[in-house]
């Protein structure tokens, strides 16, 4: 189901490049120059949409950045229902779980929502494109 959703989505977006799978089996979506997007299905058949925002630089007030992220997470208002946090490498990431049985239209809306919120958080946290790579 996920593979079909992904293929239809990238075709709709006009992406000509071949879909990539990363080391953990997630699809890498080549739809943004600012945010690295990945999509996978978990053991519960939920779809996990992840947007990697990058490392919070040491020059930044880390406590202030973490507090801002916690405020944004509260009730999901500033994250579109996604969760904003840190991965095991200390990089900021925005993650949204959605039902595995989702329509193509809803899937596209979820991807768009995560991407839009991720780009807003890049600006809010002051992370640049260089920090995404």
Curated annotation (Swiss-Prot):
Give the SUPFAM superfamilies listed for this entry: Type III secretory system chaperone-like
What Pfam family does this protein match (any one)?
CesT
Signal peptide coordinates: none
Q: Which Gene3D superfamilies does this entry report, sorted A to Z?
A: 3.30.1460.10
Q: Which GO terms describe its biological process?
A: protein secretion by the type III secretion system
- The organism's superkingdom is given as Bacteria
Q: What CDD domains does the annotation carry? A: T3SC_I-like
Q: Which InterPro entries match?
A: Tir_chaperone (IPR010261)
Identify this protein by name: Uncharacterized protein TC_0034
Residue ranges of coiled coil: none
């Amino acid at each position: 189901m996920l593979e079909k959703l992904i293929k239809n989505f990238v075709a709709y977006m006009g992406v000509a490049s071949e879909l990539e799978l990363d080391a953990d089996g997630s699809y890498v979506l080549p739809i943004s120059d600012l945010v690295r997007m990945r999509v996978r299905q978990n053991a519960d058949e939920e779809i996990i949409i992840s947007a990697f925002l990058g490392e919070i630089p040491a020059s930044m007030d880390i406590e202030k950045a973490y507090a801002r992220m916690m405020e944004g997470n509260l009730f999901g208002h500033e994250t579109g229902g996604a969760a904003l946090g840190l991965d095991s490498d200390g990089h900021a990431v925005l993650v949204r779980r959605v039902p595995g049985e989702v329509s193509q239209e809803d899937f596209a809306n979820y991807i768009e929502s995560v991407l839009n919120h991720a780009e807003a958080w890049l600006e809010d946290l002051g992370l640049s494109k260089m920090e995404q790579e």
